[in-house]
From Swiss-Prot:
CDD domains: UBCc_UBE2A_2B (cd23790). Belongs to the ubiquitin-conjugating enzyme family. GO terms for molecular function: ATP binding; ubiquitin conjugating enzyme activity; ubiquitin-protein transferase activity. This is Ubiquitin-conjugating enzyme E2 3. The gene is UBC3. Pathway: Protein modification; protein ubiquitination. Keywords: ATP-binding, Nucleotide-binding, Transferase, Ubl conjugation pathway. It comes from the Eukaryota. It catalyses: S-ubiquitinyl-[E1 ubiquitin-activating enzyme]-L-cysteine + [E2 ubiquitin-conjugating enzyme]-L-cysteine = [E1 ubiquitin-activating enzyme]-L-cysteine + S-ubiquitinyl-[E2 ubiquitin-conjugating enzyme]-L-cysteine. Expressed in all tissues examined. Lower levels found in leaves. The lineage of its organism: Eukaryota, Viridiplantae, Streptophyta, Embryophyta, Tracheophyta.
Length: 150
């Protein structure tokens, strides 16, 4: 039986295939529409440029009324990404709206890479370096980008 959540996710997947945002891809895992793998490519002309970052998205039957659980699988160094890969992003929490689809979620995460919020840190060291020593922060990001090739 196709539930409203599964119908919406099928629509999201078709839209993502038909009109993918630049630097983003995603698809259901093993033909399970409720679990997705995604890739975000680091935006050009940023320290993230050239990186390929893997994520997982897990949806419940409450989608789109509740946000997916999104985690980076790739190792990250970012003020708003926890050590376990979970992401501190308002639209994945208290600012969620059913109008957001998978493409909007992934685009927002891609934007967060370049525009972190150091006032809401998930990684205190990354937030401190971002605010106080941008050169060292960028060096650590470039290390992460190089590791993402593997």
């Amino acid at each position: 039986m196709t539930t409203p959540a599964k119908k919406r996710l099928m629509w999201d997947f078709k839209r993502l295939q038909k009109d993918p945002p630049v630097g983003i891809s995603g698809a259901p895992q093993d033909n399970n529409i409720m679990h997705w793998n995604a890739l975000i490519f680091g935006p050009e002309d940023t320290p993230w440029d050239g990186g390929t970052f893997k994520l997982t998205l897990h949806f419940t039957e409450d989608y789109p009324n509740k946000p997916p659980i999104v985690r980076f699988v790739s190792r990250m160094f970012h003020p708003n990404i926890y050590a376990d890969g979970s992401i501190c992003l308002d639209i994945l929490q208290n600012q969620w709206s059913p109008i957001y689809d998978v493409a909007a979620v992934l685009t927002s995460i891609q934007s967060l890479l370049c525009d972190p919020n150091p006032d809401s840190p998930a990684n205190a060291e990354a937030a401190r370096l971002f605010s106080e020593n941008k050169r060292e922060y960028n060096r650590k990001v470039i290390e992460i980008v190089e590791q993402s090739y593997v």
